[in-house]
Amino acid sequence: MKKVIATIFFIPALVLIGTGKASMRGSFTLENLISLESKAVDVPVELVYAVILTESSGNHLAKSEADCRGLMQVSEEVWNIFMKGKRWNLAYNPEENVRCGIRYLGDLYKMYGSWEKVLRHYHGGDPNSKRAVTNRYVKKVLKRAGMMSGDRRWVNRKEL
């Protein structure tokens, strides 16, 4: 239980400190943005933090070999769909990056209706992928989301 509680508070703090966005109480924070954007498209906040932790470990300057960028490791193709008219170099901006990533997750959920399929697609582009690396990714994200929410339904899915 202590581990769950520590995780609930640690992950948002890690993201905020890692991005330099930790701020005084009452002012707008990345945490507020994640909460607002998540609610707008019905994406669980815990899932967003779990994706951020898994994709970039909270490093807003992270860049993959495939040129995916920022906290949520969005691709240029995804960026151009969800952030129309905004320059690709803004993908390193934490606020813009999470806006894009959350919108993408919400759009994928509308298509698939399953967080497992959403994460499979988010990771490798194929909602039905059975690749071992994709299976590990999905399990890791769902486990982290479950640890943050304390909700066991995120963990130990039979279809994984």
Task: Name the predicted role of every residue range.
Residues 1-4:
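Positively charged n-region of N-terminal signal peptides that target proteins for export
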Residues 6-7, 59:
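Short amphipathic alpha-helical "recognition" segments used for binding
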Residues 7, 22-23:
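Compositionally biased, intrinsically disordered low-complexity regions
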Residues 7-15:
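Bacterial N-terminal signal peptides
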Residues 17-19:
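N-terminal signal peptide c-region/cleavage motif recognized by signal peptidases
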Residues 23-160:
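Catalytic glycan-binding domains that act on GlcNAc-containing polysaccharides
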